[in-house]
């Protein structure tokens, strides 16, 4: 009889289990797709970024430091080589290298859920086999096939083929905004009965669908939110936690929020959610992982380097992101900026005469409460841009604007 390895070992840390290969569960057991819950894989897991150096090579030192910081901050499990890790830009060897470094640094202190996805079922199976062979991998995260848009039956057969090929549990990843293929609740309910398929990361962005998923799958099936902003409602519906982007930046806070919700301490959970919701939302002001890597660079934890086709953030969105990072206490206010006059705005007008723009400070007395709206503002003939955290950002943006005949700065500057 085939056996599925369930890796368990006490780490001395409450709520955490780590790899061990001494306990085996027959595939035919009624617990076949439920045993991951025995590992207490719940709470907040970080979908790790992959740090790069300026020469585009993997920054192993930054990766090691990031993994260590995550664990020291109380994160419950780690996911290397997912969407946030820019995995499509990694070579095959680099993909395994990132997973191996994460396993080595974690040293059994938290479970490792390794990403292994392909739009070819054959390749997805081979990748899953490679990571399943690593003793430090507790489970595999695998997304719906992207680009080729399989039917529901095609997705079912794809995931079942992977599950039947490996002896590690699978967490399925439904992210139709990326893959172009939505994994519907009825299909997921069928997959929940397949040996080795133990849970799902639900990132459909559709709360009605997530509610249907929670109702359709068995109680022991693990449902994770794939979106930080809806962690609490997903847990309220029966979910077991979050596979998080924001925990790259705020691991302790995301772990505390998630544990509070799981322990029915909703006052604490809501308090943390209210404070960090702007950051959770700002992490998607441009394509993930651009904002989260930008914030980590602002924090001094990584270099802000992406691989093509990804490019650094635009100045306007970076400025908004920086402002939020300051407000939630992740980074210090820029030198020389005061709390009363931290932001700058560009006011663009074409009501009369030449098209023109004027730079204003946020506390300018000539503007409407410093929002770049001088008296007599006409929304049909004017608009404002910003805020910009630094004057240099505002000036650079103004310089790049086209079709503007006159540029000037208010006396408040």
Feature names for model-found ranges:
Residues 335-413:
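Mature, structured domains enriched in cysteine- and short glycine motifs
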Residues 35-46, 51-180:
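Active-site beta->alpha loop and helix N-cap motifs at the rims of alpha/beta catalytic domains
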Residues 164-165, 178-284:
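Catalytic alpha/beta core domains of metabolic enzymes, predominantly
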Residues 104-110, 134-136, 166-168, 193-196, ...:
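Short helix-capping segments at alpha-helix termini
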Residues 36, 40, 45-51, 73-75, ...:
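C-terminal alpha-helical cap/extension of soluble enzyme domains
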Residues 8, 17-19, 26-29, 33:
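Short, low-complexity intrinsically disordered segments enriched in A/P/G/S/L with frequent Arg
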Residues 2-3, 11, 30:
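Ala/Thr-enriched low-complexity intrinsically disordered regions
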Residues 77, 139, 199, 241, ...:
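Residues at the N-termini of beta-strands
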């Amino acid at each position: 009889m085939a056996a599925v390895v369930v890796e368990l070992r006490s780490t001395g840390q409450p709520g955490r289990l780590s790899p061990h290969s001494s306990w085996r569960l027959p595939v035919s057991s009624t617990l076949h797709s439920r045993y991951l819950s025995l590992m207490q894989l719940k709470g907040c897991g970080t979908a790790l970024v992959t740090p790069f150096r300026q020469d585009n090579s993997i920054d192993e030192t930054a990766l090691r430091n990031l993994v260590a910081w995550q664990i020291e901050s109380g994160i419950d499990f780690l996911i290397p080589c997912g969407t946030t890790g820019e995995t499509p830009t990694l070579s095959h060897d680099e993909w395994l290298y990132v997973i191996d470094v994460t396993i080595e640094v974690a040293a059994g202190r938290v479970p490792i859920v390794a990403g292994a996805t392909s739009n070819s079922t054959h390749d997805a199976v081979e990748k899953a086999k490679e990571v399943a062979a690593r003793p430090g991998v507790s489970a595999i995260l695998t997304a719906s096939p992207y680009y080729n848009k399989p039917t529901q039956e095609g997705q079912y057969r794809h995931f079942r083929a992977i599950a039947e090929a490996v002896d590690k549990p699978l967490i399925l990843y439904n992210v139709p905004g990326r893959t172009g293929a939505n994994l519907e609740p009825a299909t997921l309910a069928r997959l929940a009965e397949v040996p080795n398929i133990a849970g799902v990361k639900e990132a459909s962005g559709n709360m009605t669908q997530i509610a249907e998923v929670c109702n359709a799958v068995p109680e022991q099936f693990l449902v994770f939110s794939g979106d930080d902003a809806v962690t609490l409602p997903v847990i309220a519906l029966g979910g077991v936690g979050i596979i998080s982007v924001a925990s790259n930046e705020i691991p302790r806070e995301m772990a505390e929020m998630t544990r509070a919700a799981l322990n029915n301490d909703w006052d604490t959970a809501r308090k943390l959610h209210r404070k960090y919701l702007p950051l959770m939302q700002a992490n998607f002001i441009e394509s993930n992982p651009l904002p989260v890597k930008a914030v980590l660079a602002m924090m001094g934890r990584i270099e802000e380097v992406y691989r093509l086709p990804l490019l650094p953030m635009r100045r306007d969105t970076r400025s908004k992101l920086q402002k939020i990072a300051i407000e939630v206490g992740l980074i210090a206010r820029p030198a020389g900026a005061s709390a009363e006059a931290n932001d700058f705005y560009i006011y663009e007008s074409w009501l009369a005469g030449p098209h023109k723009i004027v730079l204003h400070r946020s506390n300018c007395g000539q503007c409407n409460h410093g929002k770049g709206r001088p008296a007599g503002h006409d929304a049909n003939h004017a608009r404002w841009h910003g805020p910009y955290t630094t004057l240099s950002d505002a000036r650079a943006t103004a310089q790049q604007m086209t079709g503007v005949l006159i540029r000037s700065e208010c006396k408040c500057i």
